[in-house]
Protein backbone atom coordinates (compact mmCIF):
# COMPACT_ATOMS: atom_id res chain seq x y z
CA UNK A 1 0.00 0.00 0.00
CA UNK A 2 1.42 3.41 -0.98
CA UNK A 3 2.13 6.02 1.67
CA UNK A 4 -0.41 8.84 2.10
CA UNK A 5 -0.05 11.93 -0.07
CA UNK A 6 0.97 14.97 1.97
CA UNK A 7 -1.42 17.93 1.81
CA UNK A 8 -0.55 21.44 2.99
CA UNK A 9 -3.12 24.12 3.86
CA UNK A 10 -1.33 27.46 3.75
CA UNK A 11 -2.99 30.74 4.70
CA UNK A 12 -2.14 34.26 5.82
CA UNK A 13 -5.14 34.11 8.18
CA UNK A 14 -6.73 31.25 10.13
CA UNK A 15 -6.54 28.64 7.38
CA UNK A 16 -10.25 27.84 7.60
CA UNK A 17 -10.96 28.83 4.01
CA UNK A 18 -8.13 26.71 2.61
CA UNK A 19 -9.12 23.77 4.80
CA UNK A 20 -12.83 23.91 4.04
CA UNK A 21 -12.45 24.11 0.27
CA UNK A 22 -9.51 21.72 0.21
CA UNK A 23 -11.33 19.12 2.27
CA UNK A 24 -14.41 19.38 0.07
CA UNK A 25 -12.22 18.58 -2.94
CA UNK A 26 -10.21 15.80 -1.29
CA UNK A 27 -13.37 14.11 -0.06
CA UNK A 28 -14.12 13.26 -3.67
CA UNK A 29 -11.19 10.82 -3.54
CA UNK A 30 -12.32 8.47 -0.80
CA UNK A 31 -10.06 5.66 -2.01
CA UNK A 32 -6.90 7.67 -1.29
CA UNK A 33 -5.29 8.60 2.02
CA UNK A 34 -3.79 11.98 2.85
CA UNK A 35 -1.59 13.37 5.60
CA UNK A 36 -2.60 16.94 6.35
CA UNK A 37 -0.47 19.88 7.50
CA UNK A 38 -2.05 23.25 8.31
CA UNK A 39 0.02 26.44 8.39
CA UNK A 40 -2.06 29.51 9.40
CA UNK A 41 -0.86 33.13 9.65
CA UNK A 42 1.85 32.81 7.02
CA UNK A 43 1.94 36.58 6.70
CA UNK A 44 5.64 37.42 6.32
CA UNK A 45 8.28 36.41 3.76
CA UNK A 46 10.21 34.63 6.52
CA UNK A 47 7.25 32.47 7.45
CA UNK A 48 6.57 31.75 3.78
CA UNK A 49 10.14 30.56 3.22
CA UNK A 50 9.92 28.33 6.29
CA UNK A 51 6.76 26.71 4.93
CA UNK A 52 8.37 26.22 1.52
CA UNK A 53 11.23 24.37 3.23
CA UNK A 54 8.75 22.06 4.97
CA UNK A 55 6.90 21.37 1.73
CA UNK A 56 10.14 20.60 -0.12
CA UNK A 57 11.35 18.38 2.72
CA UNK A 58 8.10 16.47 2.53
CA UNK A 59 8.64 15.97 -1.20
CA UNK A 60 12.11 14.57 -0.61
CA UNK A 61 11.16 12.31 2.28
CA UNK A 62 7.86 11.03 0.93
CA UNK A 63 8.82 10.67 -2.71
CA UNK A 64 5.48 12.09 -3.87
CA UNK A 65 4.73 15.65 -4.88
CA UNK A 66 2.71 17.28 -2.08
CA UNK A 67 -0.56 19.09 -2.71
CA UNK A 68 -0.86 22.66 -1.41
CA UNK A 69 -4.09 24.61 -0.99
CA UNK A 70 -3.08 28.25 -0.66
CA UNK A 71 -5.21 31.15 0.59
CA UNK A 72 -2.85 34.14 0.66
CA UNK A 73 -3.62 37.71 -0.41
CA UNK A 74 -0.14 39.25 -0.51
CA UNK A 75 1.56 38.97 -3.91
CA UNK A 76 5.10 38.65 -2.52
CA UNK A 77 4.18 35.88 -0.11
CA UNK A 78 2.29 34.06 -2.86
CA UNK A 79 5.34 34.34 -5.10
CA UNK A 80 7.57 32.79 -2.44
CA UNK A 81 5.15 29.93 -1.81
CA UNK A 82 4.90 29.34 -5.54
CA UNK A 83 8.53 28.20 -5.41
CA UNK A 84 7.60 25.14 -3.37
CA UNK A 85 7.86 21.77 -5.10
CA UNK A 86 4.14 20.98 -4.86
CA UNK A 87 0.98 20.85 -6.92
CA UNK A 88 -0.63 24.12 -5.86
CA UNK A 89 -4.19 25.39 -5.90
CA UNK A 90 -4.10 29.08 -5.05
CA UNK A 91 -7.61 30.34 -4.43
CA UNK A 92 -6.91 34.06 -4.76
CA UNK A 93 -4.73 33.66 -7.84
CA UNK A 94 -7.25 31.34 -9.48
CA UNK A 95 -10.43 33.29 -8.85
CA UNK A 96 -9.53 36.92 -8.14
CA UNK A 97 -8.57 37.74 -11.71
CA UNK A 98 -11.80 36.26 -13.03
CA UNK A 99 -13.82 38.27 -10.54
CA UNK A 100 -11.94 41.49 -11.36
CA UNK A 101 -12.73 40.94 -15.03
CA UNK A 102 -16.41 40.35 -14.35
CA UNK A 103 -16.69 43.38 -12.03
CA UNK A 104 -14.51 45.50 -14.33
CA UNK A 105 -12.43 46.76 -11.42
CA UNK A 106 -9.26 45.82 -9.57
CA UNK A 107 -9.44 44.29 -6.12
CA UNK A 108 -8.23 46.43 -3.23
CA UNK A 109 -6.83 44.49 -0.27
CA UNK A 110 -8.59 45.48 2.94
CA UNK A 111 -5.81 44.29 5.22
CA UNK A 112 -8.20 42.05 7.11
CA UNK A 113 -9.24 38.50 6.39
CA UNK A 114 -12.90 37.57 6.45
CA UNK A 115 -12.33 35.73 9.74
CA UNK A 116 -10.92 38.89 11.34
CA UNK A 117 -12.23 40.17 14.64
CA UNK A 118 -12.35 43.55 12.92
CA UNK A 119 -15.88 42.74 11.85
CA UNK A 120 -17.23 43.33 15.35
CA UNK A 121 -20.91 42.76 14.57
CA UNK A 122 -20.20 39.35 13.10
CA UNK A 123 -17.87 38.49 15.97
CA UNK A 124 -20.37 39.60 18.62
CA UNK A 125 -23.18 37.63 17.00
CA UNK A 126 -21.01 34.53 16.90
CA UNK A 127 -19.92 34.82 20.53
CA UNK A 128 -23.46 35.49 21.76
CA UNK A 129 -24.71 32.42 19.91
CA UNK A 130 -21.90 30.23 21.24
CA UNK A 131 -22.46 31.39 24.81
CA UNK A 132 -26.18 30.75 24.44
CA UNK A 133 -25.58 27.23 23.16
CA UNK A 134 -23.14 26.45 25.97
CA UNK A 135 -25.52 27.80 28.60
CA UNK A 136 -28.37 25.70 27.19
CA UNK A 137 -26.48 22.49 26.48
CA UNK A 138 -28.04 19.19 27.53
CA UNK A 139 -31.07 20.88 29.10
CA UNK A 140 -29.04 22.39 31.95
CA UNK A 141 -31.14 25.57 32.11
CA UNK A 142 -34.42 26.94 30.83
CA UNK A 143 -33.41 30.53 31.60
CA UNK A 144 -34.06 32.69 28.53
CA UNK A 145 -34.90 29.56 26.55
CA UNK A 146 -37.52 31.61 24.73
CA UNK A 147 -34.63 33.36 22.95
CA UNK A 148 -33.57 30.13 21.22
CA UNK A 149 -33.83 30.00 17.45
CA UNK A 150 -34.05 26.22 17.59
CA UNK A 151 -34.08 23.52 20.28
CA UNK A 152 -32.63 20.17 19.29
CA UNK A 153 -34.03 17.05 20.95
CA UNK A 154 -32.66 13.53 20.89
CA UNK A 155 -31.44 10.62 22.95
CA UNK A 156 -28.02 10.77 24.59
CA UNK A 157 -25.10 10.76 22.08
CA UNK A 158 -27.21 11.48 19.01
CA UNK A 159 -25.13 14.52 18.01
CA UNK A 160 -26.98 17.40 19.65
CA UNK A 161 -24.07 19.34 21.18
CA UNK A 162 -21.70 19.46 18.17
CA UNK A 163 -24.59 20.42 15.90
CA UNK A 164 -25.63 23.26 18.22
CA UNK A 165 -22.09 24.60 18.43
CA UNK A 166 -21.63 24.42 14.67
CA UNK A 167 -24.88 26.33 14.11
CA UNK A 168 -23.66 28.97 16.57
CA UNK A 169 -20.14 29.29 15.19
CA UNK A 170 -20.98 29.15 11.51
CA UNK A 171 -24.33 30.94 11.35
CA UNK A 172 -24.86 32.77 14.65
CA UNK A 173 -27.88 30.57 15.42
CA UNK A 174 -28.90 30.39 19.08
CA UNK A 175 -29.33 26.64 19.37
CA UNK A 176 -30.27 24.91 22.61
CA UNK A 177 -30.57 21.17 23.09
CA UNK A 178 -32.50 18.83 25.35
CA UNK A 179 -31.59 15.17 26.05
CA UNK A 180 -34.48 12.72 26.00
CA UNK A 181 -34.16 10.51 29.09
CA UNK A 182 -36.17 7.33 29.79
CA UNK A 183 -38.80 9.24 31.82
CA UNK A 184 -39.40 11.55 28.85
CA UNK A 185 -39.64 8.64 26.43
CA UNK A 186 -42.20 6.83 28.58
CA UNK A 187 -44.50 9.86 28.58
CA UNK A 188 -47.04 10.63 25.88
CA UNK A 189 -46.43 14.35 26.39
CA UNK A 190 -43.51 16.57 25.51
CA UNK A 191 -40.93 17.23 28.25
CA UNK A 192 -42.06 20.06 30.51
CA UNK A 193 -39.00 22.25 29.84
CA UNK A 194 -39.46 22.40 26.08
CA UNK A 195 -43.23 22.05 25.78
CA UNK A 196 -43.86 25.84 25.65
CA UNK A 197 -41.53 26.06 22.63
CA UNK A 198 -43.08 23.37 20.46
CA UNK A 199 -42.59 25.42 17.27
CA UNK A 200 -38.82 25.64 17.88
CA UNK A 201 -38.22 21.91 18.34
CA UNK A 202 -36.21 19.78 15.93
CA UNK A 203 -35.44 16.12 16.57
CA UNK A 204 -32.26 14.15 15.96
CA UNK A 205 -32.32 10.40 15.53
CA UNK A 206 -29.61 7.85 14.76
CA UNK A 207 -29.29 4.21 13.77
CA UNK A 208 -29.29 2.06 16.95
CA UNK A 209 -26.16 0.19 15.86
CA UNK A 210 -24.23 3.42 15.45
CA UNK A 211 -25.56 4.73 18.76
CA UNK A 212 -24.51 1.52 20.50
CA UNK A 213 -20.95 1.85 19.15
CA UNK A 214 -20.70 5.45 20.39
CA UNK A 215 -22.10 4.63 23.82
CA UNK A 216 -19.87 1.57 24.15
CA UNK A 217 -16.83 3.85 23.91
CA UNK A 218 -18.24 6.12 26.60
CA UNK A 219 -19.55 3.48 29.02
CA UNK A 220 -18.35 0.01 28.00
CA UNK A 221 -20.60 -2.97 28.79
CA UNK A 222 -23.25 -0.86 30.52
CA UNK A 223 -27.03 -1.09 30.19
CA UNK A 224 -26.78 2.39 28.65
CA UNK A 225 -24.69 0.92 25.80
CA UNK A 226 -26.69 -2.26 25.17
CA UNK A 227 -28.15 -2.57 21.69
CA UNK A 228 -31.63 -3.30 23.09
CA UNK A 229 -31.51 -0.06 25.09
CA UNK A 230 -30.42 1.88 22.02
CA UNK A 231 -33.13 0.37 19.84
CA UNK A 232 -35.82 1.07 22.40
CA UNK A 233 -34.75 4.69 23.00
CA UNK A 234 -34.44 5.50 19.30
CA UNK A 235 -37.85 3.98 18.53
CA UNK A 236 -39.50 5.85 21.42
CA UNK A 237 -37.86 9.14 20.41
CA UNK A 238 -39.04 8.80 16.81
CA UNK A 239 -42.55 7.98 18.03
CA UNK A 240 -42.52 11.17 20.11
CA UNK A 241 -41.39 13.25 17.12
CA UNK A 242 -44.12 11.81 14.90
CA UNK A 243 -46.81 12.07 17.59
CA UNK A 244 -46.18 15.78 18.08
CA UNK A 245 -45.36 16.63 14.47
CA UNK A 246 -41.74 17.53 15.23
CA UNK A 247 -39.45 17.49 12.17
CA UNK A 248 -36.37 15.32 12.62
CA UNK A 249 -33.27 14.09 10.81
CA UNK A 250 -31.09 11.00 11.01
CA UNK A 251 -27.52 11.90 12.00
CA UNK A 252 -25.98 8.51 11.19
CA UNK A 253 -24.59 9.33 7.76
CA UNK A 254 -24.63 13.13 7.89
CA UNK A 255 -21.67 15.37 8.64
CA UNK A 256 -22.30 18.16 11.12
CA UNK A 257 -22.09 20.61 8.20
CA UNK A 258 -24.80 18.78 6.24
CA UNK A 259 -26.96 18.44 9.32
CA UNK A 260 -26.69 22.14 10.14
CA UNK A 261 -27.77 23.19 6.63
CA UNK A 262 -30.65 20.70 6.75
CA UNK A 263 -31.85 22.22 10.04
CA UNK A 264 -31.54 25.78 8.68
CA UNK A 265 -33.73 24.89 5.73
CA UNK A 266 -36.24 22.71 7.58
CA UNK A 267 -36.79 25.28 10.33
CA UNK A 268 -36.51 28.29 7.99
CA UNK A 269 -33.87 29.83 10.23
CA UNK A 270 -32.21 33.08 9.23
CA UNK A 271 -28.46 33.14 9.70
CA UNK A 272 -27.07 36.19 11.49
CA UNK A 273 -24.01 36.54 9.27
Swiss-Prot record:
It is an enzyme of class 2 (transferase). GO terms for molecular function: ADP binding; ATP binding; phosphotransferase activity, phosphate group as acceptor; protein serine/threonine kinase activity. The keyword Nucleotide-binding applies. It catalyses: [pyruvate, water dikinase] + ADP = [pyruvate, water dikinase]-phosphate + AMP + H(+); [pyruvate, water dikinase]-phosphate + phosphate + H(+) = [pyruvate, water dikinase] + diphosphate. Keywords: Kinase, Nucleotide-binding, Serine/threonine-protein kinase, Transferase. Its EC number is 2.7.11.33, 2.7.4.28. InterPro entries: Kinase-pyrophosphorylase (IPR005177), PSRP (IPR026530). ADP binds at residues 154-161. Belongs to the pyruvate, phosphate/water dikinase regulatory protein family. PSRP subfamily. Bifunctional serine/threonine kinase and phosphorylase involved in the regulation of the phosphoenolpyruvate synthase (PEPS) by catalyzing its phosphorylation/dephosphorylation. This is Putative phosphoenolpyruvate synthase regulatory protein. It comes from Neisseria meningitidis serogroup B (strain ATCC BAA-335 / MC58). The lineage of its organism: Bacteria, Pseudomonadati, Pseudomonadota, Betaproteobacteria, Neisseriales.
